[in-house]
UniProtKB/Swiss-Prot annotation:
Tagged with keyword RNA-binding: no
Assigned keywords, A-Z: Repeat
Mapped PPR repeat ranges: 358-392, 393-427, 428-462, 463-497, 498-532, 533-567, 568-602, 603-637
Pfam family, one: PPR_1
Name under which the protein is recorded: Pentatricopeptide repeat-containing protein At1g74750
SMART domains in the record: SMR (SM00463)
The keyword DNA damage is assigned to this record: no
Similarity comment: family membership: Belongs to the PPR family. P subfamily.
Domain (Smr): residue spans on this chain: 755-838
Region Disordered, residue ranges: 21-40
Length: 855
C-alpha cells in the first residue's frame, strides 16, 4: 500500500517553503491589490517537444521555491539580476496618453451589502474596458428593452483567445487535424494587402482628441450590438484606492509601499472649471420652465462627472438652477458609472420639492447598483420603491436577475425569478434569455436548456435574439453540433439570422478550429447582404492568424480601416496576441507600440498577451518592465496575469527563471499570491487545505469560471510538481466540488462514466484522475455498485507541435501502466483509455487506488 511520505529531497524542500517561518502572515505587510480584466482565459497546459524527467524538474522546482515566491519587501524595489539583459526598448507607457485622476471614495453614502461585504472599486473578475463607442452588453441591452441593431456597427469583446494560450506552439506548424487551407483559397476572403498598414507609424485613424486620452474602454460579449459606429466618449470608471480584501476570515491583502496617484493631464477632465470652484452664496434655484430638456441632462451629467458626490456637487447643482422631471433624471442616471455618485444624486433628487421618482428611475438605479454588486442597497431601494407606490415590473426584475447572474449568484437569480411570478409579473423573453445565458456560462447547461424548454411551454416562441443567445451558450459549452442544428432550426422556422448570429457561428467554428467552415460562413454572411463589422473583422483576423496567414490578417486590418472602422484596443491586442503566439516578439512589440501611437490606452488582456510572449522566450527583464508599466498606468494585474506567472514558474528550466517568476508574482500584487503563500500543510485528513481553498474560491466568487479553472489548474500542477501531492489532491477536490471543472466527470448513460482530462495540464490531469478513481472506489464500497465502463479522455495532442505527443496523454498512460489499470483503446483512438466489466471492478477493489496520487 502506498503511504503518504516524502518521496525525495524535493518534497521536503518544497514543503519547507509553505511550512517555514518565511511564510508571511497578514501582519507582515504582504498584501495584494487586484482587479479583473474581461475575460480571457489562460489555458494551463504547456506543450513541449521533449519529455522532461519528473525527478529532474522536481529538483529544479525545489531548489528555487524557498524565497523565490516571497513578496518584495515594502519600499524595496525589485532588482533585476545582472544576468538578464537590461531593457532597452522604448517606453511601454503611452507617450501622450494620460490616465485620469482616481477619485476618492464617496464620503456621503454608507453602504451595507447583504452579500458583498466589501466595496471593491474595480470588482475582481469584472474590470471592464470601455471601447469608446456606444456599446452595451446584449443581456444588459435587452434587460433595458434596448434591442440591439443589426446594422454592423457593434464592437464586442474578442474571443478569449486574445489571452495568450500557452498550449499553442511557438512555431507556426499547424496541427494535422486541421484541414490545411491554401493561400489561394483565401483569395475570395482577403488577399494579401498591398497597402498594409505600416507598423512603425500609427495604423489607425487617430480620432481620439485630448479629452479622450487616458479613458478606459469596455469590452463586450459576443452578443452585443452597438448603436453607433462612431467612438463615444465615456469617462473612465474610477478605481477605489483600497488595497485590502478580506473574505471568510482570510486576509489576501498587500500593503503597498508605493502608492501611486495617477493624475490626468487632460485639461478640464478630472477637475471642476473655475466658475464651478467659485464660492457663491446659496440662493434658491431659479426654475427654468422653458429650458431645453437635453440641455439640462447634458449639463447635470457634466457636473456629476466633474465632482464626486458631496457638498461640492450639491452646491454646483444648486447654483445651476433647474427644474428636472423624472424622465430627465432617468437619462442622467443612465449615464452614470459610479454607483456612489448615482445613489447620492438619486436621494438628492428625492429631497427636491415637487420631484417624485417613478418606476423608470428606480429601475435604472437598480441596474447601477447591480453593476457594482451592491445587493444590500438594492434591497433597501426596492423596499423604498414599494413604499413610494412604484410597483416593480418585469424590467425591474430582469435587471435584478441580470445583476445576480453576472456576479455568479445563480441561486439568488432563481429566487428573483420565482418572486416575480409570485408578485404577478410574467417572465418575458428577456427573463428566460438571461437565465439561460448565466447558467450556461456557469457550466449548468442542463438548467439552461430546461429554461429554454420552459420558455417554449410559456408560449414564448424564440426569436432571432433568443436563438442567438442559446446558440452561443451551446457553442461555448462545447456542443457545437447542437449549436449548428439549432442554427439550422432557426432558419427553418423563418427566423432570419442577423449579423450577431453570423458572428456567433463564425466565432464558434473558429474556436473549434474549423477554420474553413468559419471562412465559408463569412462568405455566406456577405452573400446574405450583411457587411462585416468590427467583431466580424476581428474573428476573421483570428482565423487567418491561427491558420498561419498573419500577413493576410494584417490585410484585414487595413481593409477594416478603409471601411472607416476605427480599430480599438481589442483589435490591436489581437494582433499582438497572434504575433506573440507565432513566436515573433518584435512584431508583437511593434503592434503594441502602434496601439500607443494611435492614442489608445493599453488594457489588461493586451498586456497579458505581450507578457506571455516575453515569458515564453525568457525575456524576463522585459516582462518585469511590462508588469511595472501596467501598475504605473493604474492597470491591475488580473487572475489571468497571475496564472501566466505561476505557470511560467512551474515550467521554469532553471533556478534563475523560477526565482525571477516568483518575484514577478509578488510584484503583481494579486490576492492569489497570498493564497498560495498561506497554503497550510495537508495534515492527517487534508481538511485545513480544503477549508483554505474553499475560502479563497468564495472570495473570488465573482470571477468567471474559466478564469478560476485556469488558476486552479496552475495551482494543482505547481503543487504536484513540487512534491506537495496531498495538498494538490485537496485543492482539486474542492475545485471540482465547486463546479470549477463542470465537464471533468459526466455520466453518459447509466453506469457509463466519462472522465475528461484533455483541457488540463499534465500534473493536474494525474491528480484529477487519481482522486476521481479513488472516489469511484469509495462509492463502490459503500453502495456495492461498480461502473460498467469508464472512458478516460486525454486528447491525442492536437495542440502539440507533433500530433500525438500530448503530454497529458503520456502522463496518464504512464500512471495507468504503473498501477496495471485494465484499459484498452477503441477504433484506434489513442486519446481515450477505456476500462469496463469485471476487470474494472476487480481493479477498483485494490487498496492502492486510494493513494495513487501520491506516486
Amino acid at each position: 500500500m502506498i503511504r503518504a511520505k516524502h518521496i525525495s529531497n524535493l518534497s521536503s524542500s518544497a514543503r519547507s517553503f509553505f511550512l517555514s517561518g518565511s511564510r508571511p502572515s497578514a501582519a507582515d505587510g504582504n498584501s495584494c491589490t487586484c482587479a479583473e480584466d474581461e475575460s480571457g482565459v489562460s489555458k494551463r497546459q504547456q506543450i513541449r517537444t521533449e519529455v522532461v524527467q519528473t525527478g529532474k524538474r522536481a529538483s529544479n522546482l525545489a531548489a528555487g521555491l524557498a524565497g523565490s515566491i516571497l513578496p518584495v519587501e515594502a519600499g524595496k524595489p525589485l532588482v533585476v539580476p545582472k544576468t538578464v539583459e537590461h531593457f532597452t526598448r522604448p517606453s511601454l507607457l503611452p507617450q501622450h496618453v494620460s490616465s485620469p485622476a482616481l477619485p476618492g471614495k464617496a464620503d456621503s453614502v454608507n453602504h451595507a451589502s447583504a452579500i458583498i461585504k466589501e466595496d471593491v472599486g474595480v470588482p475582481i473578475g469584472d474590470q471592464i474596458f470601455k471601447a469608446g463607442i456606444g456599446n452595451v452588453n446584449l443581456l444588459s441591452d435587452i434587460a433595458n428593452y434596448k434591442i440591439p441593431l443589426s446594422d454592423g456597427t457593434e464592437v464586442v469583446g474578442l474571443p478569449k483567445s486574445c489571452m495568450v494560450d500557452p498550449t499553442r506552439p511557438i512555431s507556426g506548424v499547424k496541427s494535422s487535424n486541421v484541414k490545411v487551407i491554401r493561400r489561394e483559397h483565401l483569395a475570395k476572403v482577403y488577399p494579401r494587402s498591398a497597402d498594409r498598414v505600416p507598423i512603425n507609424s500609427s495604423p489607425g485613424t487617430k480620432q481620439a482628441s485630448n479629452d479622450v486620452a487616458g479613458k478606459s474602454f469596455e469590452a463586450h460579449d459576443l452578443l452585443s450590438n452597438n448603436v453607433s459606429g462612431k467612438r463615444k466618449i465615456m469617462p473612465q470608471r474610477p478605481y477605489t484606492d483600497s488595497t485590502r480584501y478580506a473574505s471568510g476570515g482570510c486576509d489576501y491583502s498587500v500593503h503597498s509601499s508605493d502608492d501611486r496617484t495617477i493624475i490626468s493631464s487632460v485639461e478640464g477632465f478630472g477637475k471642476p472649471s473655475r466658475e464651478m470652484m467659485k464660492v457663491t452664496p446659496r440662493t434658491a434655484p431659479t426654475p427654468r420652465q422653458h429650458c431645453n430638456p437635453g440641455y439640462v441632462v447634458e449639463n447635470v451629467s457634466s457636473i456629476l462627472r466633474r465632482f464626486k458626490w458631496g457638498h461640492a456637487a450639491e452646491e454646483a447643482l444648486h447654483n445651476f438652477g433647474f427644474r428636472m422631471d423624472a424622465y430627465q433624471a432617468n437619462q442622467v442616471l443612465k449615464q452614470m458609472d459610479n454607483y456612489a455618485n448615482a445613489l447620492g444624486f438619486f436621494y438628492w433628487l428625492k429631497r427636491q420639492p415637487g420631484f417624485k421618482h417613478d418606476g423608470h428611475t428606480y429601475t435604472t438605479m437598480v441596474g447601477n447598483l447591480g453593476r457594482a454588486k451592491q445587493f444590500g442597497e438594492i434591497n433597501k431601494l426596492l423596499d423604498e420603491m414599494v413604499r413610494d407606490g412604484c410597483k416593480p415590473n418585469t424590467v425591474t426584475y430582469n435587471r435584478l436577475i441580470h445583476s445576480y447572474g453576472r456576479a455568479n449568484y445563480l441561486k439568488e437569480a432563481m429566487n428573483v425569478f420565482n418572486q416575480m411570478q409570485e408578485a404577478g409579473c410574467e417572465p418575458d423573453r428577456v427573463t428566460y434569455c438571461t437565465l439561460i445565458d448565466i447558467h450556461a456560462k456557469a457550466g449548468f447547461l442542463d438548467i439552461a436548456m430546461d429554461m429554454y424548454q420552459r420558455m417554449q411551454e410559456a408560449g414564448l416562441s424564440p426569436d432571432t435574439f433568443t436563438y442567438s443567445v442559446i446558440i452561443n451558450c451551446l457553442g461555448k459549452a462545447g456542443h457545437l453540433p447542437a449549436a449548428h442544428r439549432l442554427f439550422c432550426e432557426m432558419v427553418g422556422q423563418g427566423c432570419t439570422p442577423n449579423l450577431v448570429t453570423f458572428n456567433i457561428m463564425i466565432a464558434l467554428h473558429a474556436k473549434a478550429r474549423n477554420y474553413e467552415t468559419a471562412l465559408k460562413l463569412y462568405r455566406d454572411m456577405q452573400n446574405a447582404g450583411f457587411q462585416p463589422d468590427k467583431v466580424t473583422y476581428s474573428i476573421v483576423m483570428e482565423v487567418l492568424g491561427h491558420c498561419g496567414f498573419l500577413e493576410e490578417a494584417e490585410g484585414v486590418f487595413a481593409e477594416m480601416q478603409r471601411k472607416n472602422w476605427v480599430p480599438d484596443e481589442p483589435v490591436y491586442g489581437l494582433l499582438v496576441d497572434l504575433w506573440g503566439k507565432a513566436g515573433n516578439v518584435d512584431k508583437a512589440w511593434q503592434w503594441y507600440q502602434a496601439m500607443l501611437q494611435a492614442g489608445l490606452r493599453p488594457n489588461v488582456p493586451t498586456c497579458n498577451s505581450l507578457l506571455s510572449t516575453f515569458l515564453r522566450v525568457h525575456r524576463m527583464s522585459e516582462a518585469y518592465n511590462l508588469l511595472q508599466s501596467m501598475l504605473a498606468l493604474g492597470l491591475h494585474p488580473s487572475l489571468q496575469t497571475y496564472t501566466l506567472l505561476l505557470s511560467c514558474c512551474t515550467d521554469a528550466r532553471s533556478n534563475f527563471d523560477m526565482g525571477f517568476c516568483g518575484q514577478l508574482m509578488a510584484v503583481s500584487g494579486h490576492p492569489a499570491h497570498m493564497f498560495l503563500l498561506k497554503m497550510p500543510p495537508a495534515g492527517p485528513d487534508g481538511q485545513k487545505v480544503r477549508d483554505h481553498v474553499s475560502n479563497f474560491l468564495d472570495f473570488m466568487h465573482s470571477e468567471d469560471r474559466e478564469s478560476k479553472r485556469g488558476l486552479m489548474d496552475a495551482v494543482v500542477d505547481f503543487l504536484h510538481k513540487s512534491g506537495l501531492k496531498e495538498e494538490a489532491g485537496s485543492v482539486w477536490e474542492v475545485a471540482a466540488g465547486k463546479n470549477v471543472y463542470p465537464d471533468a466527470l459526466r455520466e453518459k448513460s447509466y453506469s457509463y462514466w466519462l472522465i475528461n482530462l484533455h483541457v488540463m495540464s499534465e500534473g493536474t490531469a494525474v491528480i484529477a484522475l487519481s482522486r476521481t478513481l479513488a472516489w469511484f472506489r469509495k462509492q463502490m464500497l459503500v453502495s456495492g455498485d461498480c461502473p460498467s465502463r469508464i472512458d478516460i479522455v486525454t486528447g491525442w495532442g492536437r495542440r502539440s507541435r507533433v500530433t500525438g505527443t500530448s503530454m497529458v496523454r503520456q502522463a496518464v498512460e504512464e500512471l495507468l501502466n504503473i498501477f496495471n489499470f485494465p484499459f484498452f483503446t477503441e477504433n484506434g483512438n489513442s486519446g481515450c483509455f477505456v476500462g469496463s466489466g469485471e476487470p474494472l471492478k476487480n481493479w477498483l477493489l485494490e487498496s492502492y487506488v486510494e493513494r495513487m496520487h501520491l506516486l
